[in-house]
Structures are given as C-alpha cells and as structure tokens.
Design a protein with these regions (language model features):
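Extended beta-strand/beta-hairpin segments
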Residues: 1-36, 47-147
Length: 147
C-alpha cells in the first residue's frame, strides 16, 4: 500500500507503510510527515531570525521527538522540539528570542499543535569544533502562551 501526495507547490511526496499492515515500506508514514512539517516550520523561522540577527551559524538542526498514544488512533500526546545550533560566538539570548518568536508568532504548525498536545522546546549551543554544548536550556512560554 503506497500513495503519492502533492499540494499547491507541486512537489510529490511518497507515502507508504510497513509490511506488517500491508505496505511495501516504500515511503514516509503520514504521521512522520506531520512531525517533519512541525520541525521544518519552526526551523525556517528560527534560522531566518538568527540570520537577520547576524548570528554566525555553521550548522543548524531541529529534532522533534513525539510521543504517541498506545491505542488507536495513536495520536501525538506530547512533543519535544530540540534546536541544535553550532556557530561562532552565537548569542544565547538571540537563539532564545528566535525560538520564542517562532513558537508565539510565526510558526502555524506550532500554534496549531500547541492547542492539541504539550510541547517542550529545548536548545543546545555548540561552538565550532566542540563536541560538548557550550550552553543548553529551554524556552518556557509565559502562562497561557503558545507552545
């Protein structure tokens, strides 16, 4: 069982499922694409804001770890969004502000999912060439805020 999905952009995304449920394991799972969409949405916001703040970013990743319910329909029950930033003298306050702006103002995926399940937003800042983070933390929205 496999499908091809497309939207207004015209790009085609292969959708598939595991052989245990009749698939050929030949495409992304729909729930994976939801999580990838969330990661992509906030990643584009955060890196754009950091570039405007003239931060010297050499590597940037957003990892989303999503917990799902054990029983069908196996909805997402919680997510941790982890921002991993590597660069030269990256300002921690700039990273925190970029994460805040994405969560509270710009990322529609985050705004929508924040109404459905809790999200924890964490970050790790690495200096170029270092294997351990120079700084780590979390964005905690104000009471009643997004995310």
């Amino acid at each position: 069982m496999s499908f091809a999905g497309s939207a207004d952009s015209g790009f085609v995304v292969p959708l598939g499922t595991d052989s245990s449920v009749g698939g050929d394991n030949d495409g992304s799972r729909p729930m994976e694409l939801i999580v990838i969409g969330l990661a992509g949405c906030t990643a584009m916001d955060v890196i754009s804001i950091l570039q405007k703040k003239r931060q010297e970013i050499t590597s940037f990743e957003v990892r989303v770890h999503a917990d799902r319910a054990a029983d069908h329909p196996k909805v997402i029950t919680r997510a941790v969004i982890e921002y991993v930033v590597t660069g030269q003298n990256v300002d921690e306050a700039a990273v925190l502000r970029a994460i805040e702006l994405s969560a509270a103002r710009y990322c529609p995926a985050q705004a929508m999912f924040a109404k459905v399940f809790p999200m924890e937003l964490t970050y790790s800042l690495y200096e170029v060439g270092q294997s351990a983070p120079a700084k780590q933390g979390a964005y905690v929205p104000a009471a009643g805020g997004a995310a």
